Amino acid sequence: MTSSPVSRVVYNGKRPASNTRSPSSNEIFTPAHEENVRFIYEAWQCVERDLRNQVSGMDRGVVEEYVEKNPSNSLKSFKPIDLNDLKRRTVQDPKKS
């Protein structure tokens, strides 16, 4: 069985030339979808800029970690997962889905 490489999301606002799609693509993005993607991209760029400035000593206290003061009892057993790993396992073994 040949496994194809896992695709990665690129947030630089540009698509690689090898990833261009033909006009007959079934995927249609609405203006609202494109606006949401643009908003998330721009917001993330601001976070990354603030984090870089904070690390380099230019700004202090701009980016901070949110910690719940009163954690929910239902989340005590929550264990974070690596979504890339989950996708990789799903792609490698499609019979289990």
Swiss-Prot record:
Q: Transmembrane region positions?
A: none
Q: Which InterPro entries match?
A: MCRIP (IPR029428)
Q: Which UniProt keywords apply?
A: Cytoplasm, Nucleus
Cellular localisation: Nucleus; Cytoplasm, Stress granule
Q: Where is this region: Disordered?
A: 1-29, 72-97
> Where primarily located?
nucleus
Gene transcribed to yield this protein = Mcrip1
Q: Can you say what this protein is called?
A: Mapk-regulated corepressor-interacting protein 1
According to its UniProt entry, the function of this protein is described as: May play a role in the regulation of the epithelial-mesenchymal transition.
Of which family is this protein a member? Belongs to the MCRIP family.
The biased composition feature labelled Polar residues covers 17-28
Q: Which Pfam families match?
A: FAM195
Q: Which domain of life is it from?
A: Eukaryota
Give start-end positions of Basic and acidic residues composition bias.
Answer: 82-97
Kindly list the GO CC terms recorded for this protein: cytoplasm; cytoplasmic stress granule; nucleus
Q: Which GO terms describe its biological process?
A: regulation of epithelial to mesenchymal transition
Q: Which residues form a coiled coil?
A: none
